Amino acid sequence: IFQRLSEQIGPHRVIWRFDPLIVGKKLSVSSILEKIGRLGTALSAYTERLIFSFLDPYKKAMNKLHAIDPSFRPPTNEEETALAEGIARLNSFWPHSLSLATCAETADFEKLGIQHAACIDPSLLLRINPEDSDLAKLYAGTRQCHFPGAFSATRLYIKDSGQRKLCNCAPSKDIGAYGTCPHMCTYCYANTSSARTLRFFTAHDSDSSLLI
């Protein structure tokens, strides 16, 4: 699906995310890097960017994770560094080198060429829609120049005040809805009940403009 979507709309529009990074007795730094390495070999030609982040130990998420494996936990500072160094090293061997970034993280890995991401990235929006005057007014002068062809990096852009402190996203409107994804990822905070989510999914009308 990732490759097909990239071929249809362009690799700059499809961002590869690998998060959150979780460690445990059966999930070591080396095993995580092995998985990322295999995926990077397969996906690097179909995207321009990899964004990753580390597990935030929200109580509800940790309860769900510990129900599967009590050893699951966030990486230590040393493990975060090892993961970042490993990802940067893998990137140098992939068929196509990617722009690397973290999402809402305090750790600074810029010496490894890893930036702080903005998932709603104004520089990418401006790159995709360079003639959109409304976007230009809102996002012109972005400092988040993660993509070629972005505007000047010397001025600040408007940050979304509704997001957490470390989030770099520009203002946007969420068009998604909670409780609508049937993948049921254990860490996901958007699903509170599998039965409720499956009920919504079953009732979804693909011809409707609404999710539910």
Regions found by a protein language model. Give the residues of each.
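Conserved AdoMet/S-adenosylmethionine-binding subsite of the radical SAM
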Residues: 1-86, 90
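Conserved Radical SAM active-site core
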Residues: 1-11, 192-212
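A generic secondary-structure signal for well-formed alpha-helical elements
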Residues: 43, 47, 189-196
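Conserved residues at the C-terminal ends of beta-strands
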Residues: 53, 103, 191
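Flexible loop/turn segments at secondary-structure boundaries
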Residues: 59, 108-110, 184, 195-196
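A C-terminal junction/extension of Radical SAM enzymes
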Residues: 79-165
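Long, low-complexity, charged/polar intrinsically disordered accessory regions
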Residues: 137-138, 142-143, 177, 193-195, ...
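Local cysteine-cluster metal-coordination motifs and their immediate loop/turn environment
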Residues: 165-193
